[in-house]
From Swiss-Prot:
GO process annotations (BP): enzyme-directed rRNA pseudouridine synthesis
PANTHER family per record: PSEUDOURIDINE SYNTHASE FAMILY PROTEIN-RELATED, RIBOSOMAL LARGE SUBUNIT PSEUDOURIDINE SYNTHASE B
Record flagged with keyword Isomerase: yes
Keywords: Isomerase, RNA-binding
Pfam families for the chain: PseudoU_synth_2 (PF00849), S4 (PF01479)
Reaction(s) the record says it catalyses: a uridine in RNA = a pseudouridine in RNA
InterPro entries cross-referenced by the UniProt entry: PsdUridine_s_RsuA/RluB/E/F_cat, PsdUridine_synth_cat_dom_sf, PsdUridine_synth_RsuA/RluA, PsdUridine_synth_RsuA/RluB/E/F, PsdUridine_synth_RsuA/RluB_CS, RsuA_PseudoU_synthase, S4_RNA-bd, S4_RNA-bd_sf
Annotated GO MF terms: RNA binding; rRNA pseudouridine synthase activity
Catalytic residues (positions): 102
Name used for this protein in its record: Uncharacterized RNA pseudouridine synthase RT0532
SUPFAM superfamilies in alphabetical order: Alpha-L RNA-binding motif, Pseudouridine synthase
Transport is among the record's keywords: no
E.C. code: 5.4.99.-
């Protein structure tokens, strides 16, 4: 038997918390009967309906690495009718993203059919490393020589783990930035605070997973064997260049 909210979350419909709200709001039926308790147990024989749509009630967690191109937003629906990540994912089941990349950022975006798996990756206690390659215009020395930890910008504290200069030329510098908790536009705001303008931002690693040889718009599924190792924290570094 499985908790109803967990099944809805694992089906990729929404997070477990939002699944509980849908249930309490009378949006969920089991075998045609409206259910109001998120703690309700179901099994593989039950037919589950969410807002009028049937879902597969039991499915294994799956995980994909996707190279998000610039110009797409990480949402299922956009009120401004901009192009979204999920409109481009032909051939995948319904998935949700683990975290986000903003419109003008690119690189590694994790996708899953499991709200529980997404929650495991996203919660701060997971302490999963996010690595970015960042190109910026401005004086790199001012950033590197100052203390960029525990910065307070517009009332929000930012605490990047490390910022390392990779290379520079007359106009731009490339940096490697490591975060363990990503806040909205964190890197861009930190760099702007120190007088640098970010003009390219690529996420190349999330936890043990690296972007490898993927090109913008490409995706690949992580094998069940590797996924189990990631979930059990036995895999600290993985790159698949198939």
């Amino acid at each position: 038997m499985y908790r109803l909210a967990k099944i809805i979350s694992n089906a990729g419909v929404c997070s477990r918390r939002n699944a509980e709200k849908l249930i309490v709001g009378g949006k969920v039926k089991i075998d045609g009967i409206t259910i109001l308790s998120p703690a309700t147990n179901v099994d593989i024989s039950n037919q589950i309906e969410v807002s009028g749509r049937l879902i597969n009630n039991i499915q294994k967690p799956r995980l994909w690495i996707y190279y998000k191109p610039i110009g797409l937003i990480t949402t299922h629906k956009d009120p401004l009718s901009r192009k979204t990540v999920f409109e481009q994912l032909i051939g995948l089941p319904r998935v949700i993203s683990i975290g986000r990349l903003d419109l003008n950022s690119e690189g590694l975006l994790l996708l899953t059919n499991s709200g529980d798996l997404a929650h495991q990756f996203e919660m701060p206690s997971s302490k999963l490393k996010r690595v970015y390659n960042v190109r910026a215009y401005g004086n790199a020395n001012f950033l590197l020589k100052n203390n960029y930890n525990n910065l307070k910008i517009d009332g929000i504290f930012y605490n990047p783990y490390s910022i390392k200069l990779l290379r520079q030329n007359k106009n731009n510098s490339w940096f490697e930035v490591v975060l363990f908790e990503g806040k909205n536009r964190e890197i861009r705001r930190i760099f702007e605070y120190f007088g640098l303008k970010v003009n390219k931002l690529i996420r190349v690693q999330y936890g043990a997973l690296k972007i490898g040889n993927l090109k913008p718009g490409d995706y690949k599924e992580i094998s069940n064997k590797i996924l189990k190792k990631i979930i059990s924290n036995k895999l600290t570094n993985y790159i698949d260049n198939r």
